[in-house]
């Protein structure tokens, strides 16, 4: 599966939801539903409300995102 068509954006986690899902507010003001990527889940990287994250959006569904990086 090619990941060439993803859109990377910065955002801030505003709410924790069940099953490692988060509500993320992007820099442009949109709020999306984000889930943790597999590598972050595998390495037990914790995410809390207020954390700055990098998300990947697919052009097919702009309301969902994959969290790929948590800023320190």
Swiss-Prot record:
It is found in: Cytoplasm. GO terms for molecular function: ribosome binding; rRNA binding; translation initiation factor activity. It holds the Pfam family eIF-1a. Residues 1-72 form the S1-like domain. InterPro entries: NA-bd_OB-fold, RNA-binding_domain_S1_IF1, S1_domain, TIF_IF1. Keywords: Cytoplasm, Initiation factor, Protein biosynthesis, RNA-binding, rRNA-binding. PROSITE patterns: S1_IF1_TYPE (PS50832). Its main location: cytoplasm. Belongs to the IF-1 family. PANTHER family: TRANSLATION INITIATION FACTOR IF-1, CHLOROPLASTIC. Component of the 30S ribosomal translation pre-initiation complex which assembles on the 30S ribosome in the order IF-2 and IF-3, IF-1 and N-formylmethionyl-tRNA(fMet); mRNA recruitment can occur at any time during PIC assembly. One of the essential components for the initiation of protein synthesis. Stabilizes the binding of IF-2 and IF-3 on the 30S subunit to which N-formylmethionyl-tRNA(fMet) subsequently binds. Helps modulate mRNA selection, yielding the 30S pre-initiation complex (PIC). Upon addition of the 50S ribosomal subunit IF-1, IF-2 and IF-3 are released leaving the mature 70S translation initiation complex. This is Translation initiation factor IF-1 2.
């Amino acid at each position: 599966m090619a990941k060439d068509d993803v859109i990377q954006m910065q955002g801030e986690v505003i709410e924790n939801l069940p099953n490692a899902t988060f509500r993320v507010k992007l820099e442009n003001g949109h709020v999306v539903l984000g889930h943790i990527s597999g590598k972050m889940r595998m390495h037990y990287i914790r995410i809390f409300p207020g954390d700055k994250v990098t998300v990947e959006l697919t052009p097919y569904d702009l309301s969902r995102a994959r969290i790929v990086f948590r800023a320190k």
